[in-house]
UniProtKB/Swiss-Prot annotation:
Keyword tRNA processing: yes
Role noted for this protein: Folate-binding protein involved in regulating the level of ATP-DnaA and in the modification of some tRNAs. It is probably a key factor in regulatory networks that act via tRNA modification, such as initiation of chromosomal replication.
One annotated GO molecular function: folic acid binding
Protein's recorded name: tRNA-modifying protein YgfZ
Annotated GO biological process: iron-sulfur cluster assembly; RNA modification; tRNA processing
GO-annotated cellular components: cytoplasm
Organism, as annotated: Vibrio campbellii (strain ATCC BAA-1116)
Length: 322
């Protein structure tokens, strides 16, 4: 679509001010939608969050697991059109769609990948901008061609038809940028990002889903519940997701970015970043799952750039269950 060429990368240093209003084309994200008479009961029985309690003007995070409690997807759930929408990394959807539909034949529900465009609106003028589309006070609002969803202070997702997205941008004075800026905001908020290469690797608590209100321990049965409950009540989970940051000698590539941690005089692999953001002044940040007993001052380094040491940064929330 020609209008999408208006979005361009925004190269920012660690010292640069952020735009007062930016709209990011989130082509790295997609949506699974669910409609039908049984949508609520079916989804409630598949995921970690309390779907039944979700109000029309709210969104929530949740996870979908396999029978062993390993995560297929972490998503943001909200009411959209006549059903639900689950926003998540686009690369995860092929597998997640197959898994979430596995038992749907027994229910009156239609589950499919949405063709809607996902945009991210951010900046100190974001709330005012959304209010021009719908002046209601809710954190989820119906707008022309779709839905607006508040995800944080001064940050909104827009799920729109292509026609509505194009119309919205025709006279916009916002900075139009690609998805990397939104990724930065998600990293700073420590919001889990489970792309295809991280599926079926971690339980929800290792991705901090419980700390973000994405696990209900009172809702009843769902796929993988036994493992998730055991991690809480028996303390079997030994991992958590952290923000890490440090210097780069050269730009980080798009492939797996592996880190090592210091162990005495040696270095030991700790895994790959779930996602990352590259600043223009040779600094970067990312999210990674690490052992949850590491000291805050544990030394880390990039495997491919061993001269570049990284550190663990503070999370913006407690890891306790909410």
């Amino acid at each position: 679509m020609e209008w999408q060429t208006r979005f361009s990368p925004l190269n920012l240093s660690t010292q640069d001010a952020l735009p007062e209003l930016s709209i990011s084309l989130l082509d790295n994200l997609g949506m699974i939608t669910m409609v039908g008479d049984d949508k609520k009961s079916y989804l409630h029985g598949q995921v970690t969050c309390d779907v039944v309690s979700l109000e029309k003007d709210q969104s929530m995070l949740g996870a979908h697991c396999d029978a062993k409690g390993k995560v297929w997807s972490v998503f943001r759930l909200f009411h959209h059109n006549d059903g639900y929408a689950m926003v998540q990394p686009k690369s995860a959807i092929e597998v997640e769609l197959k898994e979430i539909k596995k038992y749907a034949v027994f229910s009156k529900v239609t589950i499919e990948e949405s063709s809607d465009i996902v945009l991210g609106v951010a900046g100190e003028n974001a709330d005012a901008f959304i209010s021009t589309l719908n002046a209601d006070s809710g954190e989820v609002r119906t707008v022309e061609g779709g839905t607006a969803v508040k995800v944080a202070s001064n940050r909104w997702l827009l799920a729109l038809t292509a026609e509505a997205a194009q119309s919205l941008l025709e006279d916009s004075q916002a900075t139009l940028t690609t998805h990397e800026l939104w990724t930065r905001f998600d990293i700073e908020a420590a919001l889990p990002y489970v792309a295809a290469d991280a599926q079926n690797e971690h339980i929800p608590q290792a991705l901090n889903v419980q700390a973000l209100g994405g696990i209900s321990f009172t809702k009843g049965c769902y796929t993988g519940q036994e493992t998730v409950a055991r991690a809480k009540y028996r303390g079997t989970n030994k991992r958590a997701m952290y923000i890490v940051k440090g210097a780069t000698a050269e730009a980080l590539g798009e492939g797996a970015i592996e880190l090592e941690r210091s162990v005495g005089e040696n270095w030991r692999s700790v895994g790959a970043l779930l996602t990352h953001y590259q600043f223009s002044d040779n600094q970067a940040m990312g999210l990674i799952v690490l052992p949850n007993n590491l000291d805050d001052d544990t030394r880390l380094r990039l495997v491919t750039q061993p001269e570049c040491e990284w550190e663990i940064a503070a999370l913006p929330y407690s890891l306790d269950d909410e």
